[in-house]
């Protein structure tokens, strides 16, 4: 029974998504329906957490805009998610970056991972 559920979840998972980790800055493009029209909306932020696995995996992004911190969660395997692009790789030593919530300005930044390790990641 467990194998059947795993096979069904593997069928529903998308394979076109790029690999990213917590601390990376990514750009997520989603389809938005407004008044009978569809458009693509882009949200760029730092990955705070990845939760779940398989078809129900979610990612939480954090961004500071106009002095206010905002968070948005995305279901990775949703058909509304058009694309995910890695802007820069971050160097962190935590699996969850919830300490970014109260920070603004330079304190809310994550160090950038540069060099050959950034390309391998």
UniProtKB/Swiss-Prot annotation:
Keywords: Ribonucleoprotein, Ribosomal protein. GO terms for biological process: translation. One of its GO terms (molecular function) is structural constituent of ribosome. Coiled coil: none annotated. It holds the Pfam family Ribosomal_L19. One of its GO terms (cellular component) is cytosolic large ribosomal subunit. Belongs to the bacterial ribosomal protein bL19 family. PANTHER family: LARGE RIBOSOMAL SUBUNIT PROTEIN BL19M, RIBOSOMAL PROTEIN L19. This protein is located at the 30S-50S ribosomal subunit interface and may play a role in the structure and function of the aminoacyl-tRNA binding site. This is Large ribosomal subunit protein bL19. The gene is rplS.
